[in-house]
């Protein structure tokens, strides 16, 4: 594919930035290789809708090779490698990529002339004890599906209270409550979507639980939601969430997270499952 006179551009990550770079380089005098551990591109702004069962996961994912094919003739210089980038040797100009074959992992050393890094981001728990073990993050399609399944399993477990004498009322309530930490765009969207899910489909599907209002708490360490947005939008978001039944708590700093919920620095405990 690569000739001595054709530079190779390797792009790590087939997210928005990686695909944008590949499209800009399509048809140019270079060979482009996209590297990603998934063979699909997920539309991350809609992860919260997958997590709350509003849309199916396949509706926000597109195969990377289909995206390349849609580039038409210009995309002939763009290729894709399914694997996970593990490191780069800039002196030798090689990218180490871990691939799987027949269930076995091995490493490839992919040469490059130019390397573009767009691997995305990971959730920062700021060192809060218990967050990694007991909390969910929402950065990938797999995490969104995992959260959705957890919500549904929690409601199924709570519904057993009618036949399970060992389930206490407090345990039943805890399984019906969700806590969202962070009042940015994702947190606001997720809290609102959870409230809609509990007030709508889950209330209809679990009538014996007697849900009268959603049990969703949104914790924000700052003095307002959506920092950086115009004040009128920040105020509207809080009013709207409150009207939907979301318990919005500002200045709420999480000290630790346990299997029973979140514990705040002011001594409060917000129970959830």
Protein language model features and the residues they cover:
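Beta1-alpha1 glycine-rich phosphate/pyrophosphate-binding loop at the start
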Residues: 2-82, 178, 185-229
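A Rossmann-like FAD-binding core segment of flavoenzymes
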Residues: 71-97, 195-273
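Short hydrophobic core segments
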Residues: 12, 110-120, 254, 272-273
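FAD-binding core/adjacent interface of flavoenzyme oxidoreductases
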Residues: 2-6, 78-177
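Internal, well-ordered alpha-helical segments in soluble enzyme and binding-protein domains
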Residues: 143, 147, 174, 187-190, ...
